[in-house]
Amino acid sequence: MQEQYRPQDIEQKVQEHWDNNKTFVVNEDPNKEKFYCLSMFPYPSGRLHMGHVRNYTIGDVVSRYQRLQGKNVMQPIGWDAFGLPAENAAVKNKTAPAPWTYENIEYMKNQLKLLGFGYDWSREFATCTPEYYRWEQEFFTKLYNKGLVYKKTSSVNWCPNDQTVLANEQVEDGCCWRCDTPVEQKKIPQWFIKITEYAQELLDDLDTLDGWPEMVKTMQRNWIGRSEGVELSFAVNGEEAPLEVYTTRPDTLMGVTYVGIAAGHPLAEKAAATNPELFAFTEECRNTKVAEAELATMEKKGMDTGLRAVHPLNGREVPIYVANFVLMDYGTGAVMAVPAHDQRDYEFATKYGLDIIPVIKPEDGSELNVSEEAYTEKGVLFDSGEFDGLAFQDAFDAIAAKLEAEGKGKKTVNFRLRDWGVSRQRYWGAPIPMVTTEDGEVHPVPADQLPVILPENVVMDGVTSPIKADKEWAKTTFNGEPALRETDTFDTFMESSWYYARYCSPQADDILDPEKANYWLPVDQYVGGIEHACMHLLYSRFFHKLLRDAGYVTSNEPFKQLLCQGMVLADAFHHTNEKGTKEWIAPTDVTIERDAKGRIEKAIDDQGREVQHSGMIKMSKSKNNGIDPQEMVDKFGADTVRLFMMFASPADMTLEWQESGVEGASRFLKRVWKLVHEHTNKGTVEALDVAALSGNQKALRRDVHKTIAKVSDDIGRRQTFNTAIAAIMELMNKLNKAPQESAQDRALLDEALKAVVVMLYPMTPHASFEMWEALGETDIDTATWPTFDKNALIEDEKTIVVMINGKLRAKLIVAADATEEQVKELGLKDENAIKFLDGLTIRKVIYVPGKLLNIVAN
């Protein structure tokens, strides 16, 4: 073992050892308990960022800890390789997406290896290869044959200038990002998978996910959005078909004063056909894409269609308005409006001078006032005819029953969740395996003709997908008849919805090998960002249930335990230029002055300009405040970067990047290395004789085993990695001060250092590997996690604090089994106690067993 800790000398050597010995390559072993640890796989954007490093370090720490518990641990890695950024980069760099993607994979793979992550590289795959997406295509055709896939027209963002479909992220302020043309909404046929068929099960099974953060489960519950309500019909004057609406508040039915419909509703389209003003308004609504979250705050706009709806119970006629807050994608595309009891309806009614009729009053008898805002609480009905006096649930049931009896409505369960639209009008994705024959019939591509391969040698013009532009590519046959291929590709969430399962058998000649999949699944620990709570995590749960129902897996859920790591923040600095826009300056190009409390007082960039500090914000390219992991590894070594990542903050909280903190982690590792080097240089160590230890030696050994117990619990159960590292640091402070004179001093230090090195191994595997060998052991990768000796925690002596009139005046060392009388006697005889009690009369002596003697005197 070299005297100085120089990571650059050891890390590559240890990584080569892992590669040569295939240390992390695993197979199914029915005799060992398995542990499947997975971090969300990266998109190969070109370089790793600190968010990646944090995510993968957490996963690696958990994996290595579980290995040392004797488990058969699988930790795979791969590449989520399809997606829009590759198309954009290809246009910019005048290349095709495929070579750009594969080059990035090679570069990032090398970065992951330099960080020392213990991956089973034999399981690696990229989702953009036919070997992967072929099985996705086949599974899709199976779902189609089961009736779980369908095609319907749906709205997309359309650029009329480029004649192309835009992804949501390509629409900037309602305009095309490329040519600044106002974007329109266009309806085109798209493919959907019936996730709604599984809505109730997806909701119910959240209750089985005890290892998931409550916040993520709540987000999914809200996203699925189960509600119980009533579906009812309003007759429309002059129309044959009634207007269907869904409401969760049938108790307010007698307060309906208008009906709102979406711009895309058939009634709106029919009315607009003969009304130019209404047509212009519906077009405006259609081309203003509104997120559901914005509905509450946006300006409410509407226009009377001239149509009248007939109230299903009292026969009153109410106007039908096209309203911009009603979305065609939700419910029936129509809402019954009760301004007195819904704030959105209230604002709209106030704006357009519509009636506001209250029908619910507070249950407590307090005065009802709807002069300034709606009364939205549940209460008691009035002015509602036969339903007067009923409270919410009774009114709900009675009104639903009456509607049902008259054939005008029924109780129903509704979900906010919509079927999963998987069509994308992009090139760089897996082709959807469907064909259309000349008679207009749609068919799945037969299994023996899969995969439908995406051509990789293409030219990107930045406007049209190459497979849409190449008319020859789409030409094929079906049962000998001419046919055209589907030129849309899958939503890239398709690939990431089942990748975790493919790792179990990446070479299988089917989507999965059930035997291998059922050995490894479900994933025991999943690590990734909370931003994936409602899309990726929900789609993966859905896909798992589809795989189960197809007979591939036996478990109901894909991920047992979920850890959502916090974001990585860094200082951000900007300079406001002559045009008044902010130029973001990299923190590495800024010299800062701090005040006594460490706050930034002044910041000067490398051009000598004073720049503004914008605070600690998420590392991003746009704010130019990302720190390159490569630079940090080159400067400090992978182990130091990993240690800082795990120590600087709880794993699920934001982490503030401070290079001073990285320097602190480096100093700590050097101290551990130095002590191990000094200890091993003194030669062989005799066996530890626990029975012969002195009082001080026993106390130190107690600290060692208390630390083992705490670190085991912090990493294994609580996942508070930062407190585990803090406990190891605290122990190291004691070991650095411990005597090394006697043979048993050295034997005790040997036991302690071996425990420290193994406990640090999940965070700092390279340094631990070297120190473990120096301590005379072989291959830390197959070592066993230290077990704490319960007997070491038994104390022969206890320290009792003596308080006199609330002030600490003495400390007593007493036998662990000393009685209350013995402690009181020793306390009153203590020379410090005698000094402070001189001239006072003792009024009370209170003993808190094993801790405190409290004397009250005056």
From Swiss-Prot:
Keywords: Aminoacyl-tRNA synthetase, ATP-binding, Cytoplasm, Ligase, Nucleotide-binding, Protein biosynthesis. The keyword Chloroplast does not apply. One of its GO terms (biological process) is leucyl-tRNA aminoacylation. The lineage of its organism: Bacteria, Pseudomonadati, Pseudomonadota, Gammaproteobacteria, Vibrionales. It catalyses: tRNA(Leu) + L-leucine + ATP = L-leucyl-tRNA(Leu) + AMP + diphosphate. InterPro entries: aa-tRNA-synth_I_CS (IPR001412), aa-tRNA-synth_Ia (IPR002300), Leu-tRNA-ligase (IPR002302), Leu_tRNA-synth_edit (IPR025709), M/V/L/I-tRNA-synth_anticd-bd (IPR013155), Methionyl/Leucyl_tRNA_Synth (IPR015413), Rossmann-like_a/b/a_fold (IPR014729), tRNAsynth_Ia_anticodon-bd (IPR009080). GO terms for molecular function: aminoacyl-tRNA deacylase activity; ATP binding; leucine-tRNA ligase activity. Belongs to the class-I aminoacyl-tRNA synthetase family. This is Leucine--tRNA ligase. A motif ('KMSKS' region) lies at residues 618-622.
